[in-house]
Amino acid sequence: ISGVISDNATGTNNTSVRKGGSGTWVLDGVNTYTGETRIDQGTLKIKANAATSTIIADASEIRFELIEDNQTGPDNTFNDFANSRGGGNFEFVGNADETNVETLGALNSRDGANTVRLTAGGGTGTASLVFDTLSTIQDDSTLNFDLSGGNGGNITFTNYTTQNSNIDDAKVYV
């Protein structure tokens, strides 16, 4: 998806992005939406557009969560996903020979086996993600951080404290 995903024209509502079902979406436009980015299943890749990347707004939450069939979501809309566990991948892909950083809001893992992955663009390039906080990891969820393709890049949480986080019987893998 190379075009811009933006909030509505009046600015009264935040637009959110929801990746559902198997398969892969790639975002590489300069998006201005300020709602959450939700991955129910499959892979959502964001491809750096500059050294300081702006694919997703800095305050946008990244959330792994699947609402099961026959349930209503937080937006009161009936979902259409098969009755299964969630689980998805969020991948940041850097540019060749550039030090790429994407800054985001909170990271939440609420359902399924999930992975946050870094992939450098090649050459001397690196890929790094900066999240505001690791907000929630529920006990029926696992969260894997795969830095192996980041060419020395990092995943950083700038405001993480255990006092303001909902970390149940978490399973976190690096």
PLM segments and residue spans:
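Extracellular repeat-rich scaffold modules on cell surfaces
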Residues: 1-58, 112-174
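Extracellular beta-solenoid/beta-roll
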Residues: 27, 38-113
